[in-house]
Curated annotation (Swiss-Prot):
<protein>
    <recommendedName>
        <fullName>Glucose-1-phosphate adenylyltransferase</fullName>
        <ecNumber>2.7.7.27</ecNumber>
    </recommendedName>
</protein>
<dbReference type="InterPro" id="IPR011831">
    <property type="entry name" value="ADP-Glc_PPase"/>
</dbReference>
<comment type="subunit">
    <text>Homotetramer.</text>
</comment>
<comment type="pathway">
    <text>Glycan biosynthesis; glycogen biosynthesis.</text>
</comment>
<feature type="binding site">
    <location>
        <begin position="179"/>
        <end position="180"/>
    </location>
    <ligand>
        <name>alpha-D-glucose 1-phosphate</name>
    </ligand>
</feature>
<dbReference type="InterPro" id="IPR023049">
    <property type="entry name" value="GlgC_bac"/>
</dbReference>
<feature type="binding site">
    <location>
        <position position="190"/>
    </location>
    <ligand>
        <name>alpha-D-glucose 1-phosphate</name>
    </ligand>
</feature>
<comment type="function">
    <text>Involved in the biosynthesis of ADP-glucose, a building block required for the elongation reactions to produce glycogen. Catalyzes the reaction between ATP and alpha-D-glucose 1-phosphate (G1P) to produce pyrophosphate and ADP-Glc.</text>
</comment>
<dbReference type="Pfam" id="PF00483">
    <property type="entry name" value="NTP_transferase"/>
</dbReference>
<dbReference type="InterPro" id="IPR056818">
    <property type="entry name" value="GlmU/GlgC-like_hexapep"/>
</dbReference>
<dbReference type="Pfam" id="PF24894">
    <property type="entry name" value="Hexapep_GlmU"/>
</dbReference>
<dbReference type="GO" id="GO:0005524">
    <property type="term" value="F:ATP binding"/>
</dbReference>
<comment type="similarity">
    <text>Belongs to the bacterial/plant glucose-1-phosphate adenylyltransferase family.</text>
</comment>
<dbReference type="InterPro" id="IPR005836">
    <property type="entry name" value="ADP_Glu_pyroP_CS"/>
</dbReference>
<dbReference type="InterPro" id="IPR005835">
    <property type="entry name" value="NTP_transferase_dom"/>
</dbReference>
<feature type="binding site">
    <location>
        <position position="164"/>
    </location>
    <ligand>
        <name>alpha-D-glucose 1-phosphate</name>
    </ligand>
</feature>
<keyword id="KW-0321">Glycogen metabolism</keyword>
Length: 380
């Protein structure tokens, strides 16, 4: 099967900085914005950009992620000219081996990529929130004759030392790469989005692992090698909204930004939809005792308490006398009577008993998936 460009999403990360929220699932499967999961944004970007054949490389706790993606029907990837393939670590003649890094994950799946026979390979992270046209990036890649194009975004100078920084010339050619430099020379941060000419990348990876010169990571190994070897490496400047939601603070802030009617993601844009797989649920019920202000409430929820500036995912229940402010309530969570929740993230299926106070004023409070807090007496 010949593809001009194959999309490969790296979705195997543990997401340890998200703590309890990734205890039993990979970071790309974490719910976001009421009715989505983080990986939905990357998958939807692929589909909207015309990239209809996608491999999703998983590793850590893949069950929820695999179930969410399924056969790709929610993204229109279930027909003869499209498809999504889940790629997990497997045993070969050399035995089983976990992916050691981003580039190693690609190397371990060369068989799948060769079967798809792409001219270009688009390598993506499955744990960022953004909307991006990869076709425009491919157009630039072709125009410049690049061997590798790296998507970059300008970050605040005081945050640049937290990223891989690309230093470019006047033609946007990358001349130097620094991984989390103490004194950055530019603020062009790598987004972890790459377009490679597949034939050349394949050659580099095979030669490297055959000679035990393991290039396990794109940022630490492959990009520096390309630059040192004189390959044509260009930056693609991205100007839109992009969030790395790898920490509790960043995940909470990104969700709160979602409540702004003028947020940069603009999910009302019918020309660039974000698709997801959502359970069929009845309409939400707003009880007579409920008070709701500046909130997002998804289907299947029952609200009898007060909700202010918060996101409530599908099938959430909030009983009478409870007050939820500045918080994210993930799918299936149940909150009892006279509960106070402020600046918190409540995990999927969590149960909060009556009269509990969860206060994240000093630090965002987190209740894990299926965690039970307090004594429950309300109806399930």
């Amino acid at each position: 099967m010949k593809n001009e460009m194959l999309g490969v999403i790296l979705a195997g990360g543990k997401g340890t900085r998200l703590g309890k929220l990734t205890h039993n699932q990979a970071k790309p499967a974490v719910p976001f914005g009421g009715r989505y999961r983080i990986i939905d944004f990357t998958l939807s970007n692929c589909v909207n950009s015309g990239v209809k054949n996608i491999g999703v490389i998983t590793q850590y706790q893949p069950l929820n992620l695999n179930a969410h993606i399924g056969n790709g029907a929610s993204w229109g990837l279930d027909d003869l000219n499209a498809g999504v393939t889940i790629l997990q670590p497997y045993s070969n003649n050399e035995g089983s081996k976990w992916f050691e890094g981003t580039a190693h994950a690609i190397y371990q799946n060369i068989g799948y990529i060769d079967q798809m026979d792409p001219e270009y390979i688009l390598i993506l992270s499955g744990d960022h929130i953004y909307k991006m046209d990869y076709e425009a990036m491919l157009d630039q890649h072709k125009e410049t004759g690049a061997s590798l194009t790296v998507a970059v975004i300008d970050v605040p100078w005081d945050e640049a030392s937290r990223f891989g920084i690309m230093n470019t010339d006047d033609n946007n050619r990358i001349i130097d790469f620094e991984e989390k430099p103490a004194e950055p020379k530019s603020n062009h941060a790598s987004m972890g989005i790459y377009i490679f000419n597949w034939k050349r990348l394949r050659e580099v990876l095979v030669n490297s692992f055959t000679r035990n010169q393991d290039m396990v990571d794109f940022g630490k190994n492959v990009i520096p090698y390309y630059l040192k070897s004189g390959e044509s490496v260009f930056a693609y400047n991205f100007k839109g909204y992009w969030k790395d939601v790898g920490t509790i603070d960043s995940l909470w802030h990104a969700n709160m930004e979602f409540l702004d009617e003028n947020n940069e993601l603009n999910l009302q844009d019918r020309t660039w939809r974000i698709y997801s797989r959502n359970p069929i649920a009845p309409p939400q019920i707003i009880a007579e005792t409920a008070e709701i202000k500046d909130a997002m409430i998804v289907d299947g929820s029952y609200i009898a308490g007060k909700v202010d500036h918060s996101i409530l995912s599908a099938n959430v229940r909030i009983q009478t006398g409870s007050v939820v402010t500045d918080s994210v309530i993930m799918p299936g969570a149940k909150i009892g009577k006279n509960v106070t929740i402020h600046r918190a993230i409540i995990g999927e299926g969590a149960v909060i008993g009556d009269d509990v106070v969860i206060d994240g004023t000093d630090e965002i409070a987190v209740i894990g998936n299926k965690e039970v807090v307090g004594v429950t007496s309300h109806e399930e």
